Amino acid sequence: MNIRGAPDLGQPSDDPSSGGERERIRQRMKMVIGQLEGILRELKEVAKELREVVSQIDKLTSDFDFELEPDDWTTATVSSTSSSDKAGMGGPFDLGHLDFMTADILSDSWEFCSFLDVSTPSDSVDGPESTRPGAGPDYRLMNGGTPIPNGPRVETPDSSSEEAFGAGPTVKSQLPQRTPGTRERVRFSDKVLYHALCCDDEEGDGEQEVEEEEVGLPPEPAHTEAHAGPHKPSPAPYKSRRSPLTSRHSGSTLAPEQTRRVTRNSSTQTVSDKSTQTVLPYTATRQKARGKN
């Protein structure tokens, strides 16, 4: 027992067990160090291989000129020596000589886009040569520069139709251009409009002059352009149609026959202001009277 009265455990008895543990720890440390040394040797070998790979890459890329301006980067990426050489070897992916690989076109993106627009084969496949732009005459130059979506029109617009007094060239240019395949709406010709408006003018000119003399208006000159052609109706009947209405509003009394004539003229004037109307077959008034008899 020691001075404090505690039993002495005897340290010499613990030395063999502690020494064995130390030896095991030392052996494990040596083993770990050996593994680390092996890893370092492998890393050194990998570094040597990487140096060899870098040297081979330098040899392969020795003919490249990497000192380029920013504008020439697209040319370097598209038409590099390695890719162009492989494309020209005649392999399965050989596309032949490509015109857009030149530096002049690739230096400017707008020129490259214009090259693509010009060289697309869809222009020659979609339709015949007559439908290409520039193959035929420019129809927009006709009719005072007004764009005509369905081609040229031989007839000029009627003086009473809305095409002559309606929207000008600026409004028509804003409308979407229709293709020739979408002609669903009937386009009225000037002949139909002329027969719809002036069917009673030739046979009623004499009665109209008599009525104007009775009302007190000066007689109008004879209708000389009636035989010239149906494409150019004279605007004189429209003035005469308004004159009985004006005289009636002024307070003059008219005979029943004259009132019927005025009503017929006013209805004809109303028809002339409508551009969308159903096309009916023209039948002269004399033929209608014969059919009733």
From Swiss-Prot:
- In UniProt terms, what function does this protein have? Component of the protein machinery at the inhibitory synapses, probably acting as a scaffold. Inhibitory synapses dampen neuronal activity through postsynaptic hyperpolarization. This synaptic inhibition is fundamental for the functioning of the central nervous system, shaping and orchestrating the flow of information through neuronal networks to generate a precise neural code.
Question: In what ranges is there compositional bias, type Polar residues?
Answer: 171-180, 243-256, 264-286
Q: How does it assemble?
A: Interacts with GPHN.
What is the gene name?
INSYN1
A Gene Ontology annotation in the biological process aspect, one of them, is: postsynaptic specialization organization
Please give the name of this protein.
Inhibitory synaptic factor 1
Q: Which InterPro entries match?
A: Largen/INSYN1
What PANTHER family does this protein map onto? INHIBITORY SYNAPTIC FACTOR 1 (PTHR15917:SF3), PTHR15917
Q: Which organism is it from?
A: Homo sapiens
- Subcellular location per the Swiss-Prot or TrEMBL entry: Postsynaptic density
The record's keywords, sorted A to Z, are:
Coiled coil, Synapse
Q: Does the keyword Signal apply?
A: no
Q: Which family does it belong to?
A: Belongs to the INSYN1 family.
The principal localisation class reads: other
